[in-house]
Design a protein with these regions (language model features):
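Accessory DNA-binding and partner-docking regions appended to nucleic-acid-acting proteins
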Residues: 1-3, 337-338, 349-353, 363-365, ...
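Short, charged low-complexity linear segments at domain edges
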Residues: 359-389
C-alpha cells in the first residue's frame, strides 16, 4: 500500500496535515530528519507510516512509559502490530515481546532511552532488521532544553553500535536555535532533512490574568468549563493540594498529581483522569508529558512556570484534537520569587562543573525574564510566544486576552506619584490591597485600625476604581519602580528608579487597557448535543469494556463528524474522520444503530 492508502486504512484520514507528507517522503527515501511540529500536529504519523511502508521493525525512543502504553494501545486498536518494552512488564512479558520481535510480528517497538544501554537489547536489535529509529521528545538531549535527560545522550552511542545504521528521525514540539543545534549534533543526524511546520496552535486561546484573588478566578474558569476535562498546574506540591482541596470544597471533584505521591496513587489518578472518571486534575509539572489525552478543553497555570518552553508544552496539552480550548495563566509577582528560589536551589546538575552550572543558571534567569515578559505583555500573547521560538509575526492574532483588550498610551506620571507617595507616607509596610484602599478612600476596618485615613494620600485617587489602581501598581512593579517583598504577605517598597518620577524630573507613559477584555465564548463545531452525548456514552462503554481510554476508541472530533454526517451504513461510516478499516469493522455496528434511531426520532 502507498502512504495515502495506509493513512486511510489505519488512521482514517483522507489527507495529510501540514508537513506530514514531506517528512514521510524524506524518511522513506532513507534520509535522516529533524522535525519541529506543534503538539497535536501529528508527529507520530510521520514515523508510523514509513514504518508500515518498510521491511523490519521501527524502534521508537520515548521518554515516558505512560505515553508508550497509550500509543501502542492506539496502534493496536487501529490494527497495527506494535509493542513496548519497559520496566512495567514482568520478565515473562518482556521475553514474550522480544520473542515476537525476533519473529517479525511487530512493525514498531517503543522503548525508553535507558533500555538502549542494556546489552541484551543491543543484541536483539542486531539480530533483526531495523527499518528506522524515531526519537520522540528530542529536546530532552539538550542541556538548554526544558527537560534535559542524561539518558538521551546515550542514543547516538547505541546507534553507532548497530551493525547496520538505519535512518534516524528526531521529533519535538519546542526547540530554540540552541536546542536545535544540540539535537543535530548529539543525536548524530547525518545530512538531515529539517522542517519546522510552525509552532502556532490556532485552536488555543491564550490569556494572562492578574486577579487579586486567584482562587475566585479559578472557580470562574472551572465553572465556565463545567463537565469538561481540564488541567490546573501549580508550582509547588503544597499549592497542588491547597488548590485541589479548594475545588473539592466548592463542588468540583479534582485529583492531584505530584512527585511526593506514591507511584500507585499517581498512576491511579492519571488513569482516572485519562479515562474520564474525573474531569479535573491539579498537578505540578511532573504531570502531562506522557499524556496523549486529546480532549483537554482548558489548562490553567495557577502559578507562572519557569520558562516559555515549559509553558507552551504544558499549555499545549489542551486541544490536541484541534477543537477550541483555553490556556489561562494566573500571574502574580510572587510567582517570580518562587521560580528564582528554584533556580538558586537547583541540584539536578550536581554532576556538572561549577562553570557549567553557572552557565545554566544564567540561561535559566534569561528564560525566566522572557517568561515574565509574557505575563506582563500588553501586546499579542501568541506573537510573543511564536517570536520567542523564532517564528516572527506582526499581525495580531485576535485570539488572546491582549488582543481582546483595547489599549491606549497614557501619561501616568501624576497617578504614579500619588501611588509612590502613598507607599512612602505609610512607612513602606503595606501590600497592594491596603495601598489601593488608602488611595481610593476606603472606609474598611483596617484603614481605621491603622489610622491610615489620617494620611495625606488618603482618598487622593477616589475618582478611580480599585481595579484601576491595582493595575497601575502592578505595572509599576513590572517596570521596577516598586518592588515586592518575598514574605507571606508581600509588602510594597519604592526603588531608586522611582525617585526621578517622585521629584518630577521624569514623566511616565504606559499602554493601559481602556476597554476590558471582551468575553470569548467557547466554540465547537455545531452538533446536536443529544446525539453527541449518546455517542459519548457508547464510546465510554466500549472503552471500559476494552480497558482503554475513551479517546483510543474515537476522539471527540470523530464523534462530532458522526453527528454532522449521520452515517447509516458501513461505507458511510468509513468516511468519518478517524475511522479506518479496522475501526469500521469493529465499531460501525456499535454506533450506526444509535445514529439510525436518532434520525428516525428527529426526522
Amino acid at each position: 500500500m502507498d502512504k495515502f492508502e495506509l493513512l486511510k486504512q489505519y488512521f482514517g484520514h483522507d489527507s495529510f496535515r501540514d508537513g506530514q507528507e514531506n517528512i514521510i517522503d524524506n524518511i522513506s527515501s532513507g534520509r535522516d530528519a529533524l522535525c519541529i511540529m506543534p503538539t497535536g500536529g501529528g508527529k507520530s504519523i510521520c514515523y508510523q507510516i514509513p514504518a508500515l511502508m518498510s521491511d523490519g521493525i521501527a524502534i521508537v525512543i520515548s521518554p515516558l512509559i505512560s505515553l508508550m502504553k497509550d500509543q501502542v494501545t492506539s496502534l493496536n486498536q487501529n490494527g497495527i502490530r506494535a509493542a513496548y518494552i519497559n520496566s512495567t512488564l514482568t520478565p515473562a512479558q518482556q521475553s514474550r515481546a522480544i520473542y515476537n520481535a525476533m519473529r517479525g510480528e511487530y512493525k514498531l517497538i517503543y522503548v525508553a532511552p535507558e533500555r538502549l544501554e542494556a546489552p541484551a537489547f543491543l543484541n536483539l536489535c542486531n539480530s533483526i532488521k531495523i527499518s528506522l529509529i524515531a526519537v520522540d521528545e528530542a529536546h530532552c538531549v539538550s542541556q538548554w532544553g526544558h527537560d534535559f535527560r542524561t539518558s538521551y545522550l546515550k542514543i547516538s552511542d547505541f546507534i553507532s553500535k548497530l551493525d547496520d545504521r538505519p535512518v534516524v528521525s528526531a521529533f519535538t514540539a519546542t526547540a530554540t536555535d540552541a536546542v536545535k543545534r544540540d539535537i543535530l549534533n548529539l543525536l548524530g543526524l547525518k545530512n538531515p532533512f529539517e522542517i519546522t511546520t510552525g509552532f502556532d496552535r490556532k485552536n488555543l486561546f491564550f490569556a494572562v490574568k492578574r486577579p487579586q484573588n486567584k482562587q475566585k478566578e479559578l472557580l470562574a474558569i472551572v465553572s465556565e468549563h463545567k463537565n469538561q476535562s481540564g488541567i490546573i498546574y501549580c508550582a509547588t506540591r503544597k499549592n497542588v493540594e491547597k488548590v485541589s482541596d479548594f475545588l473539592n470544597e466548592n463542588g468540583y471533584d479534582s485529583l492531584i498529581y505530584h512527585a511526593g505521591l506514591s507511584n500507585e496513587i499517581r498512576s491511579k489518578n492519571q488513569d482516572d483522569f485519562i479515562n474520564d472518571r474525573c474531569n479535573l486534575i491539579v498537578a505540578t509539572n511532573a504531570f502531562g508529558m506522557g499524556i496523549d489525552k486529546p480532549d483537554v478543553r482548558f489548562v490553567v497555570h495557577y502559578n507562572m512556570p519557569k520558562n516559555l518552553e515549559n509553558y507552551y508544552q504544558e499549555a499545549g496539552r489542551a486541544g490536541r484534537d484541534g477543537e477550541n480550548s483555553d490556556c489561562v495563566l494566573l500571574y502574580s509577582p510572587g510567582d517570580v520569587h518562587t521560580q528564582k528560589f528554584f533556580i538558586e536551589n537547583n541540584d539536578e546538575n550536581a554532576e556538572l562543573t561549577e562553570e557549567q552550572r553557572e552557565k545554566i543558571k544564567k540561561n535559566d534567569y534569561y528564560k525566566l525574564n522572557e517568561m515574565v515578559g509574557y505575563c506582563t505583555s500588553t501586546t499579542c500573547l501568541r506573537n510573543y510566544i511564536l517570536n520567542y521560538f523564532g517564528e516572527y509575526h506582526t499581525n495580531e492574532c485576535k485570539n488572546c486576552s491582549a488582543c481582546l483588550k483595547e489599549y491606549k498610551l497614557t501619561d501616568v506620571t501624576v497617578d504614579s506619584q500619588k501611588i509612590l507617595s502613598c507607599i512612602i507616607r505609610t512607612g513602606q509596610r503595606f501590600g497592594t490591597s491596603t495601598i489601593s484602599a488608602v488611595l481610593a478612600g476606603s472606609k474598611s476596618e483596617n484603614i481605621y485600625k491603622y489610622r491610615l485615613n489620617n494620611q495625606s494620600t488618603y482618598g487622593i485617587m477616589s475618582d478611580k476604581r480599585r481595579t484601576v489602581i491595582n493595575e497601575l501598581i502592578t505595572r509599576l512593579i513590572d517596570e521596577e519602580y516598586i518592588t515586592q517583598t518575598e514574605d507571606k504577605y508581600p509588602v510594597l517598597k519604592v526603588t531608586q528608579k522611582s525617585y526621578p518620577i517622585l521629584k518630577g524630573q521624569k514623566s511616565l507613559t504606559m499602554r493601559l487597557a481602556v476597554k476590558e477584555e471582551l468575553h470569548r465564548e467557547i466554540q465547537h463545531t455545531e452538533v446536536d448535543k443529544v446525539l453527541f452525548d449518546k455517542l459519548k456514552e457508547r464510546r465510554k462503554y466500549l472503552a471500559d469494556k476494552a480497558s482503554v481510554p475513551p479517546y483510543v476508541i474515537f476522539s471527540d472530533a470523530s464523534l462530532r463528524d458522526m453527528c454532522a454526517k449521520l452515517p447509516t451504513n458501513e461505507n458511510d461510516f468509513l468516511r468519518i474522520s478517524g475511522v479506518g478499516i479496522k475501526k469500521q469493522e469493529k465499531y460501525a455496528k456499535e454506533f450506526i444503530p444509535i445514529i439510525k434511531e436518532y434520525k428516525e426520532e428527529k426526522f
